[in-house]
Structure formats: C-alpha cells, structure tokens
UniProtKB/Swiss-Prot annotation:
PANTHER family: NUCLEOSIDE DIPHOSPHATE KINASE (PTHR46161), NUCLEOSIDE DIPHOSPHATE KINASE DDB_G0292928-RELATED (PTHR46161:SF3). Keywords: ATP-binding, Cytoplasm, Kinase, Magnesium, Metal-binding, Nucleotide metabolism, Nucleotide-binding, Phosphoprotein, Transferase. This is Nucleoside diphosphate kinase. PROSITE patterns: NDPK_LIKE (PS51374). It comes from the Bacteria. One of its GO terms (cellular component) is cytoplasm. Its cofactor is Mg(2+). The gene is ndk. One of its GO terms (molecular function) is metal ion binding. It is found in: Cytoplasm. Belongs to the NDK family.
Length: 140
C-alpha cells in the first residue's frame, strides 16, 4: 500500500485526563508519523459541520456537546496504509469490544467518550484534514 494521510482527533476526554502524550506514543509506536497537530477548542459550528453525517441520529446533540466541552487535539497522521492502520490502532468504537493494546481499550471511558476519532476512508481523510489544516500547517 502507498503512503497516505489520515485525520485524527484526540477528544475532550483525552485532553481533560492529560493523556494526549500517551495516546501519541501509541500512534507513533504503530509506525504513524504525526505531521500536523494543533490543540483547539472546537466551536459548535465546527462540530456540527464535522459530524453532519450524524445529524439525524439521536446522539447528534450529545456528540456536539461533548466535542465542544473542552479542548481537542486535531492531527494529520501519515504512513503506509494510514487510514486502515489508524483504525486498527484506535480499536472498536465501544471500548469494551476493543482489542487489547488499542487506544480505546487502554484509555476510553465509554462509547460516548472514546478518546479518539479517525477517518474511515482516504476520501473522508482529505475532507476532514481540509476542515482544520492547510498544506502549510503540515510538515511531512
């Protein structure tokens, strides 16, 4: 597989518990490079746009509230087969079902506060990266 980029968010539960360094260590140990990273406070508008695909789902309001409840760390990750690799490293959405050694198994508190977001496809990664970064922000 080719070298590619994916998008990651370390969610408010990770920043609140001061575990972003530990999560980054897992990401880097998996062979992914963090080539762009910023700590931001996501606005309601940013969260609603980012999670627009879930707008009709019953958890949408709670998700937006959670994602705006504290700082997040937005990241661009790069590596071979980065999208699939990061999804594997994150683990299942429900931490109780996540494999040992994954970020969610190690750090997530619940399905709702599951520490990280990662793009589900290369196309979505490009769209998600563009919402928070421009090429000048990425040091490959």
């Amino acid at each position: 597989m080719a070298n590619e980029r994916t998008f990651s968010i370390l969610k408010p539960d990770a920043t609140r518990r001061n575990i972003t360094g530990a999560v980054n260590a897992v990401i880097e140990a998996a062979g992914l490079r963090i080539v762009g990273q910023r700590r931001i406070r996501m606005t309601r508008e940013q969260a609603e746009k980012f999670y627009e695909v879930h707008k009709e789902r019953p958890f949408f309001g709670e998700l937006v509230e959670f994602m705006t409840s504290g700082p997040v760390v937005v990241q661009v990750l790069e590596g071979e087969n980065a999208v699939a690799k990061y999804r594997e490293v994150m683990g299942a959405t429900n931490p109780a079902q996540a494999a040992d050694g994954t970020i969610r198994k190690q750090f997530a508190e619940s399905v709702g506060e599951n520490t990280v977001h990662g793009s589900d496809s290369a196309d979505n990664a490009r769209l998600e990266i563009a919402q928070f970064f421009n090429e000048a922000d990425i040091a490959a």
